[in-house]
Amino acid sequence: MGRTKLVGLAVGVLVLPLASTVGVPSAAAKNGDTHITGQGLEQTLDCNNSTLLVNGTGNRINAMGTCWAVTVQGSSNVVIAENVINDITVYGWDQTVFFKNGDPALIDRGRELALVNQISRVPA
């Protein structure tokens, strides 16, 4: 292999990773996201404009203030949120997420697998 081909190959190896990241939006996650993991927990918290992630079973979470997003995994969790800005994503089955304000995208990944979940707006 000649010197020209080696230089071209080296430049290609260096440029390709950079080209694949140009224009990629930054993630919306920030320090302060709240993670709740457990069974049978009852908790009231301030979302603080961050993402609330609930993972487990039988948890009952009251989220005050504004949440950027709410994500629930597991089964039989109940989340009541005052305001959700971006999205509510639910995995698993028998999950319930109520929100009072906001216009989030509602994504029910469990329903895609014929699992029953409930995501609903309720009166403030």
Task: Report residues per predicted region.
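Extended beta-solenoid/beta-helix repeat architectures
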Residues: 20-124
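Secretory targeting and sorting signals
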Residues: 1-29
